A protein has these predicted regions:
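Alpha-helical transmembrane segments and their helix-entry boundary regions
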Residues: 19-20, 152, 184, 249-251
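Transmembrane alpha-helical segments and their membrane-interface loop/helix boundaries
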Residues: 1-135, 251, 258-461
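Membrane-water interface at transmembrane helix exits
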Residues: 159-163, 207, 211, 237, ...
Length: 461
């Protein structure tokens, strides 16, 4: 690095009002992105906490009624403390950096009602989508800033790093000194880009410091991925501005490449994966569920008799208990069995799409960074799919606990209820999808080095 050129460029930047405004804009937007994501996550977490509190309050009341019945304290109706009325909450807890990478959290269900009354499709608690325009363009979080806005800021700072001197004929006078044009461009870009990179890292470190339960590996992964991504863009800008004789020509090329990497390739990749691995028909899933529910309701007596023949040790309990409980439980079981093939198709289709996107992401460093960061934050499709799968298994376990009591019109004991684990414990013990960042980082750094090396080789020749 040529210190004279470097500090001279810093002095020029200090005297440039446009550059100062651009850097101030970068500072404000970068910190705003962290604040915006944190504010959204706080509101989301408050909503989930309130939901959990409401469901747990109902569960406590149900347990209190069951305890009173076991202790013979007062009379109870046939509807009181029935196992079909058990309600337990299940919420999707994301990673420590989810406030900087909202990902799929805005549009995927994050809270479920776990109850024998529900099946895999009806356990999703009602929730409200955000403003459609917000969902269309994406919420302002740090991932949006660093993947979409930061490259534009790098382009705005560096597109005329040498073109204006060439147009005014000043480059020849500058090159009369013992320096090459490539050296001039490199030092000027280092001076201009270093301040922006410092701002980005400052906002990133701020976002990491406000995270709860952040591990060193996650923090190091974020910093390394962001630096590798910015290094790629610096290499690309270095190549374009070195070959552009006019600033407008270089700017148009860089903006076109930004559109290609940030918008066109990600959209095309999603279209390709959707075409290759289409989702099964949701109408078919709903139709199968309705048919199964209808058939199970009609055959309640037959299904109950078949169950009792398989379990002769059980006897029918309180005759005052309405058959609706038994019918609902049996219909949910039939729905689960009849829709299992198409639900499996949904899961396999999602897995195939994600596996294909893991390959197609290497067409665009922007996609690489986005997918890597939201995967670390556990706000990606794989994490949400695992959440729904874990909740479905949790519901099946509860159904196994209450099945005998429901079908024989009896209650479960308080001890049996207390042995049911809460969903948070199960989710914490669940193995999360592994995230590999070595290949993404190595690929982006390799691209940056190739672009810089190609530019230097051309300048020497």
């Amino acid at each position: 690095m040529n210190k004279a050129l470097f500090f001279c460029e810093l002095l020029r930047m200090r005297r440039s009002l446009a550059t100062q405004l651009l850097l101030v804009f970068a500072l404000l937007v970068s910190f705003y992105s962290v604040w915006s994501g944190s504010a959204w996550q706080m509101a989301q977490q408050n909503s989930l906490d309130q939901y959990v509190e409401t469901v747990e309050e109902k569960s406590s009341e149900w347990r209190a009624d069951l305890t009173a019945i076991e202790n013979g304290e007062g009379e109870s109706s046939p509807y009181t403390a029935r196992p079909m009325d058990i309600q337990l909450p299940a919420v999707h807890k994301t990673g420590a950096t989810s406030h900087m990478a909202i990902g799929m959290t805005e549009i995927m269900p994050a809270r479920l009602v776990i109850s024998p009354r529900r099946n895999g499709m009806s356990m999703i608690a009602p929730y409200e989508f955000d403003n459609p325009m917000t969902l269309l363009f994406g919420r302002m979080d740090f991932v949006f800033f660093v993947t979409i806005i930061a490259p534009l800021l790098l382009i705005a700072l560096n597109f005329d790093v040498i073109a204006s001197d060439r147009a005014q004929g000043l480059s020849k006078m500058l090159l009369s000194n013992p320096v090459t044009e490539t050296t001039v461009i490199a030092n000027r870009m280092i001076a201009r880009s270093s301040i922006l990179i410092f701002i980005v890292l400052l906002a990133l470190i701020f976002g990491l410091t406000v995270a709860d339960n952040l591990t060193f590996s996650d923090a190091a992964s974020w910093v390394t991925l962001v630096l590798a991504y910015l290094f790629f863009w610096i290499g690309l800008i270095f190549l374009i501005v070195s070959q552009s004789q006019r600033g407008f020509s270089g700017l148009s090329k860089l903006v076109s490449l930004w559109l290609l990497f940030a918008l066109i390739i990600p959209a095309a990749s999603n279209s390709i994966t959707t075409y290759l691995f289409p989702q099964p028909s949701k109408l078919e899933l709903l139709s199968d569920a309705r048919s199964a529910t209808s058939e199970a309701t009609k055959q309640t007596a037959e299904l109950t008799q078949r169950f009792l023949e398989d379990h002769p040790e059980l006897t029918i309990g309180d005759d005052q208990v309405p058959g609706y409980y038994r019918a609902l439980f049996l219909s949910n079981s039939v729905v689960r069995e009849s829709t299992q093939p198409i639900v499996k198709d949904f899961s396999e289709s999602m897995k195939d799409r994600e596996d294909m996107l893991d390959i197609l992401q290497y067409l665009s460093p922007t996609t690489i960074l986005q997918r890597s960061l939201i995967a670390i934050a556990q706000t990606d499709s794989r994490s949400h799919s695992l959440f729904l799968e874990t909740a479905g298994q949790y519901l099946s376990n509860i159904n196994n606990v209450v099945e005998d009591s429901v079908l024989t019109s009896n209650r479960i004991s308080v001890d049996t209820f207390d042995q049911i684990k809460i969903f948070d414990e199960i989710w914490e013990a669940t193995q999360k999808p592994s995230v590999s960042i070595f290949s993404p980082i190595a690929f982006m750094v390799f691209l940056g080095l190739v672009l810089i090396g190609f530019t230097r080789k051309n300048s020497k020749s």
